[in-house]
Protein backbone atom coordinates (compact mmCIF):
# COMPACT_ATOMS: atom_id res chain seq x y z
CA UNK A 1 0.00 0.00 0.00
CA UNK A 2 2.85 2.34 0.87
CA UNK A 3 4.49 1.68 -2.52
CA UNK A 4 1.22 2.52 -4.28
CA UNK A 5 0.96 5.79 -2.35
CA UNK A 6 4.56 6.73 -3.16
CA UNK A 7 4.02 5.93 -6.84
CA UNK A 8 0.85 8.02 -6.90
CA UNK A 9 2.65 10.95 -5.26
CA UNK A 10 5.48 10.68 -7.77
CA UNK A 11 3.06 10.68 -10.71
CA UNK A 12 1.39 13.77 -9.24
CA UNK A 13 4.80 15.47 -9.02
CA UNK A 14 5.44 14.65 -12.68
CA UNK A 15 2.04 16.08 -13.64
CA UNK A 16 2.95 19.24 -11.74
CA UNK A 17 6.20 19.34 -13.72
CA UNK A 18 4.22 19.09 -16.96
CA UNK A 19 2.02 22.00 -15.91
CA UNK A 20 5.03 24.10 -14.88
CA UNK A 21 6.64 23.29 -18.23
CA UNK A 22 3.53 24.55 -20.01
CA UNK A 23 3.65 27.76 -17.98
CA UNK A 24 7.35 28.22 -18.80
CA UNK A 25 6.82 27.54 -22.50
CA UNK A 26 4.07 30.15 -22.70
CA UNK A 27 5.44 32.88 -20.46
CA UNK A 28 9.11 32.73 -21.47
CA UNK A 29 8.40 34.27 -24.86
CA UNK A 30 5.39 36.42 -24.15
CA UNK A 31 6.50 39.60 -22.33
CA UNK A 32 4.74 38.70 -19.09
CA UNK A 33 7.54 37.28 -16.85
CA UNK A 34 8.12 33.52 -16.82
CA UNK A 35 9.92 33.49 -13.46
CA UNK A 36 7.14 35.52 -11.87
CA UNK A 37 4.52 33.10 -13.17
CA UNK A 38 6.50 30.04 -12.05
CA UNK A 39 6.86 31.47 -8.54
CA UNK A 40 3.12 32.11 -8.40
CA UNK A 41 2.01 28.81 -9.92
CA UNK A 42 4.34 26.80 -7.71
CA UNK A 43 2.83 28.58 -4.72
CA UNK A 44 -0.43 26.77 -5.47
CA UNK A 45 0.91 23.55 -7.00
CA UNK A 46 3.31 23.12 -4.09
CA UNK A 47 6.01 21.05 -5.78
CA UNK A 48 7.21 18.85 -2.91
CA UNK A 49 10.90 19.55 -3.25
CA UNK A 50 13.49 21.59 -1.37
CA UNK A 51 13.58 25.36 -1.83
CA UNK A 52 17.06 25.10 -3.37
CA UNK A 53 15.80 22.63 -5.97
CA UNK A 54 12.75 24.74 -6.80
CA UNK A 55 14.89 27.88 -7.20
CA UNK A 56 17.21 25.98 -9.54
CA UNK A 57 14.29 24.29 -11.32
CA UNK A 58 12.61 27.63 -12.13
CA UNK A 59 15.70 28.71 -14.05
CA UNK A 60 17.06 25.50 -15.57
CA UNK A 61 13.79 24.51 -17.29
CA UNK A 62 14.35 27.58 -19.46
CA UNK A 63 16.80 25.39 -21.38
CA UNK A 64 13.84 23.55 -22.87
CA UNK A 65 12.33 26.84 -24.02
CA UNK A 66 15.55 28.12 -25.58
CA UNK A 67 16.08 24.87 -27.48
CA UNK A 68 12.87 25.68 -29.33
CA UNK A 69 14.49 28.88 -30.64
CA UNK A 70 17.50 26.90 -31.84
CA UNK A 71 15.24 24.45 -33.68
CA UNK A 72 12.98 27.06 -35.30
CA UNK A 73 15.80 29.39 -36.33
CA UNK A 74 18.53 26.78 -36.91
CA UNK A 75 19.09 27.59 -40.58
CA UNK A 76 19.13 31.31 -39.93
CA UNK A 77 21.53 31.05 -36.99
CA UNK A 78 23.86 28.44 -38.46
CA UNK A 79 26.75 30.07 -40.38
CA UNK A 80 27.71 26.66 -41.76
CA UNK A 81 24.27 25.96 -43.22
CA UNK A 82 24.69 24.38 -46.69
CA UNK A 83 23.48 26.61 -49.48
CA UNK A 84 24.20 29.92 -47.76
CA UNK A 85 25.95 32.50 -49.89
CA UNK A 86 29.14 34.20 -48.70
CA UNK A 87 27.06 37.31 -47.97
CA UNK A 88 24.56 35.32 -45.88
CA UNK A 89 27.37 33.64 -43.94
CA UNK A 90 28.89 37.04 -43.20
CA UNK A 91 25.53 38.38 -41.99
CA UNK A 92 25.09 35.34 -39.74
CA UNK A 93 28.47 35.92 -38.08
CA UNK A 94 27.62 39.60 -37.65
CA UNK A 95 24.33 38.60 -36.03
CA UNK A 96 26.17 36.41 -33.53
CA UNK A 97 28.59 39.26 -32.79
CA UNK A 98 25.63 41.52 -32.05
CA UNK A 99 24.25 38.86 -29.70
CA UNK A 100 27.60 38.57 -27.90
CA UNK A 101 27.87 42.35 -27.53
CA UNK A 102 24.31 42.52 -26.15
CA UNK A 103 25.14 39.80 -23.61
CA UNK A 104 28.03 41.70 -22.03
CA UNK A 105 25.98 43.96 -19.69
CA UNK A 106 23.79 41.16 -18.33
CA UNK A 107 26.77 38.83 -17.92
CA UNK A 108 28.59 41.45 -15.84
CA UNK A 109 25.68 42.62 -13.71
CA UNK A 110 24.16 39.14 -13.49
CA UNK A 111 27.28 37.67 -11.91
CA UNK A 112 27.64 40.72 -9.69
CA UNK A 113 24.06 41.04 -8.44
CA UNK A 114 22.42 37.61 -8.80
CA UNK A 115 22.84 36.49 -5.18
CA UNK A 116 21.79 39.88 -3.80
CA UNK A 117 18.72 40.03 -6.04
CA UNK A 118 17.68 36.53 -5.05
CA UNK A 119 18.10 37.29 -1.35
CA UNK A 120 16.32 40.66 -1.31
CA UNK A 121 13.95 40.92 -4.28
CA UNK A 122 12.46 37.45 -4.74
CA UNK A 123 9.10 38.19 -3.16
CA UNK A 124 5.50 38.81 -4.17
CA UNK A 125 5.64 42.56 -3.77
CA UNK A 126 8.61 43.07 -6.07
CA UNK A 127 7.07 40.74 -8.67
CA UNK A 128 3.76 42.63 -8.45
CA UNK A 129 5.38 46.05 -8.75
CA UNK A 130 7.46 45.05 -11.76
CA UNK A 131 4.47 43.46 -13.46
CA UNK A 132 2.52 46.71 -13.12
CA UNK A 133 5.42 49.04 -13.97
CA UNK A 134 6.28 47.22 -17.17
CA UNK A 135 2.61 46.84 -18.01
CA UNK A 136 2.21 50.61 -17.90
CA UNK A 137 5.45 51.01 -19.86
CA UNK A 138 4.22 48.73 -22.64
CA UNK A 139 0.94 50.62 -22.98
CA UNK A 140 2.67 54.01 -22.97
CA UNK A 141 5.45 53.02 -25.38
CA UNK A 142 3.02 51.39 -27.81
CA UNK A 143 0.80 54.48 -27.72
CA UNK A 144 3.82 56.66 -28.52
CA UNK A 145 5.03 54.17 -31.12
CA UNK A 146 1.88 54.60 -33.21
CA UNK A 147 3.12 58.08 -34.13
CA UNK A 148 6.74 57.09 -34.74
CA UNK A 149 8.10 54.97 -37.58
CA UNK A 150 10.78 52.45 -36.51
CA UNK A 151 14.33 53.25 -37.63
CA UNK A 152 15.38 49.60 -37.90
CA UNK A 153 13.10 47.17 -39.73
CA UNK A 154 15.75 44.62 -40.69
CA UNK A 155 17.94 42.82 -38.16
CA UNK A 156 20.85 42.87 -40.61
CA UNK A 157 20.79 46.68 -40.51
CA UNK A 158 20.77 46.91 -36.72
CA UNK A 159 24.00 48.47 -35.46
CA UNK A 160 26.28 47.02 -32.80
CA UNK A 161 25.53 50.06 -30.65
CA UNK A 162 21.81 49.35 -30.80
CA UNK A 163 22.48 45.73 -29.86
CA UNK A 164 24.45 46.91 -26.82
CA UNK A 165 21.62 49.24 -25.76
CA UNK A 166 19.15 46.36 -25.95
CA UNK A 167 21.59 44.36 -23.83
CA UNK A 168 21.45 47.10 -21.20
CA UNK A 169 17.67 46.71 -21.06
CA UNK A 170 18.13 42.97 -20.54
CA UNK A 171 19.99 43.77 -17.29
CA UNK A 172 16.66 44.98 -15.86
CA UNK A 173 15.26 41.46 -16.22
CA UNK A 174 17.41 40.39 -13.27
CA UNK A 175 14.63 41.85 -11.13
CA UNK A 176 11.89 39.21 -10.58
CA UNK A 177 8.66 40.00 -12.38
CA UNK A 178 10.31 42.08 -15.10
CA UNK A 179 10.44 39.50 -17.93
CA UNK A 180 13.59 39.08 -19.99
CA UNK A 181 11.65 39.12 -23.25
CA UNK A 182 9.58 42.06 -22.02
CA UNK A 183 12.65 44.12 -21.10
CA UNK A 184 14.49 43.48 -24.37
CA UNK A 185 11.45 43.88 -26.63
CA UNK A 186 10.54 47.13 -24.88
CA UNK A 187 14.16 48.23 -25.08
CA UNK A 188 14.31 47.42 -28.77
CA UNK A 189 11.19 49.45 -29.49
CA UNK A 190 12.51 52.39 -27.44
CA UNK A 191 15.83 52.48 -29.33
CA UNK A 192 14.03 52.41 -32.67
CA UNK A 193 13.60 48.83 -33.88
CA UNK A 194 10.38 47.39 -35.22
CA UNK A 195 8.44 44.90 -33.10
CA UNK A 196 9.50 41.98 -35.27
CA UNK A 197 13.19 42.93 -35.10
CA UNK A 198 12.96 43.42 -31.33
CA UNK A 199 11.26 40.03 -30.92
CA UNK A 200 13.71 38.22 -33.20
CA UNK A 201 16.72 39.67 -31.42
CA UNK A 202 15.14 38.81 -28.07
CA UNK A 203 14.88 35.16 -29.12
CA UNK A 204 18.50 35.05 -30.32
CA UNK A 205 19.81 36.93 -27.29
CA UNK A 206 18.13 34.34 -25.09
CA UNK A 207 20.37 31.53 -26.34
CA UNK A 208 23.65 32.50 -24.61
CA UNK A 209 21.86 34.36 -21.82
CA UNK A 210 19.63 31.49 -20.74
CA UNK A 211 22.26 28.82 -21.24
CA UNK A 212 24.68 30.86 -19.15
CA UNK A 213 22.19 31.68 -16.39
CA UNK A 214 20.88 28.12 -16.21
CA UNK A 215 24.43 26.80 -16.04
CA UNK A 216 25.28 29.26 -13.27
CA UNK A 217 22.23 28.21 -11.24
CA UNK A 218 23.03 24.51 -11.69
CA UNK A 219 26.66 25.00 -10.64
CA UNK A 220 25.64 27.01 -7.56
CA UNK A 221 23.10 24.33 -6.67
CA UNK A 222 25.78 21.64 -6.50
CA UNK A 223 28.45 23.90 -4.97
CA UNK A 224 26.05 24.54 -2.08
CA UNK A 225 26.16 20.81 -1.34
CA UNK A 226 22.88 19.81 -2.96
CA UNK A 227 22.43 16.58 -4.89
CA UNK A 228 20.02 15.59 -7.65
CA UNK A 229 18.00 12.44 -7.11
CA UNK A 230 16.66 10.34 -9.96
CA UNK A 231 13.17 11.59 -9.22
CA UNK A 232 14.28 15.23 -9.31
CA UNK A 233 16.14 14.66 -12.57
CA UNK A 234 12.96 13.19 -14.07
CA UNK A 235 10.91 16.17 -12.88
CA UNK A 236 13.42 18.56 -14.41
CA UNK A 237 13.52 16.62 -17.68
CA UNK A 238 9.73 16.35 -18.01
CA UNK A 239 9.27 20.07 -17.36
CA UNK A 240 12.04 21.02 -19.81
CA UNK A 241 10.70 18.81 -22.61
CA UNK A 242 7.21 20.21 -22.06
CA UNK A 243 8.56 23.77 -22.14
CA UNK A 244 10.35 22.95 -25.40
CA UNK A 245 7.24 21.58 -27.10
CA UNK A 246 5.00 24.43 -25.95
CA UNK A 247 7.62 27.03 -26.95
CA UNK A 248 7.61 25.73 -30.52
CA UNK A 249 4.00 26.87 -30.83
CA UNK A 250 4.25 30.05 -28.73
CA UNK A 251 7.22 31.50 -30.64
CA UNK A 252 5.43 31.03 -33.96
CA UNK A 253 2.23 32.47 -32.48
CA UNK A 254 4.00 35.59 -31.21
CA UNK A 255 5.75 36.28 -34.52
CA UNK A 256 2.44 35.98 -36.38
CA UNK A 257 0.61 38.02 -33.74
CA UNK A 258 2.90 41.05 -33.89
CA UNK A 259 2.51 41.30 -37.66
CA UNK A 260 -0.97 42.75 -37.05
CA UNK A 261 -1.02 43.70 -33.36
CA UNK A 262 1.06 45.56 -30.81
CA UNK A 263 1.98 44.61 -27.22
CA UNK A 264 -0.72 46.66 -25.49
CA UNK A 265 -2.76 43.59 -24.54
CA UNK A 266 0.24 42.16 -22.71
CA UNK A 267 0.66 45.44 -20.85
CA UNK A 268 -2.95 45.27 -19.66
CA UNK A 269 -2.52 41.63 -18.65
CA UNK A 270 0.57 42.51 -16.61
CA UNK A 271 -1.26 45.26 -14.73
CA UNK A 272 -4.21 43.01 -13.86
CA UNK A 273 -1.92 40.16 -12.80
CA UNK A 274 0.26 42.54 -10.80
CA UNK A 275 -2.74 43.76 -8.81
CA UNK A 276 -3.81 40.16 -8.14
CA UNK A 277 -0.30 39.23 -7.00
CA UNK A 278 -0.10 42.29 -4.76
CA UNK A 279 -3.44 41.41 -3.16
CA UNK A 280 -2.42 37.78 -2.68
CA UNK A 281 0.93 38.79 -1.19
CA UNK A 282 -0.78 41.17 1.23
CA UNK A 283 -3.28 38.51 2.33
CA UNK A 284 -0.51 35.97 2.83
CA UNK A 285 1.55 38.47 4.85
CA UNK A 286 -1.37 39.38 7.09
CA UNK A 287 -2.93 35.97 7.62
CA UNK A 288 0.14 33.77 7.08
From Swiss-Prot:
Give the note: Bacitracin is thought to be involved in the inhibition of peptidoglycan synthesis by sequestering undecaprenyl diphosphate, thereby reducing the pool of lipid carrier available.
What is its subcellular localisation? Answer: Cell membrane
The membrane-spanning stretches of this chain are 25-45, 53-73, 93-113, 121-141, 171-191, 196-216, 231-251, 263-283
GO BP annotation list:
cell wall organization; peptidoglycan biosynthetic process; regulation of cell shape; response to antibiotic
Q: What is the membrane topology noted in the UniProt record heading this document? A: Multi-pass membrane protein
- Name of this chain's protein: Undecaprenyl-diphosphatase
Catalytic reaction(s) noted? di-trans,octa-cis-undecaprenyl diphosphate + H2O = di-trans,octa-cis-undecaprenyl phosphate + phosphate + H(+)
Top-level EC class: hydrolase
Q: What is its EC number?
A: 3.6.1.27
- Provide the species name: Streptococcus thermophilus (strain ATCC BAA-250 / LMG 18311)
What protein family does this chain belong to?
Belongs to the UppP family.
Q: Which UniProt keywords apply?
A: Antibiotic resistance, Cell membrane, Cell shape, Cell wall biogenesis/degradation, Hydrolase, Membrane, Peptidoglycan synthesis, Transmembrane, Transmembrane helix
Summary of the function given for this chain in its UniProt record:
Catalyzes the dephosphorylation of undecaprenyl diphosphate (UPP). Confers resistance to bacitracin.
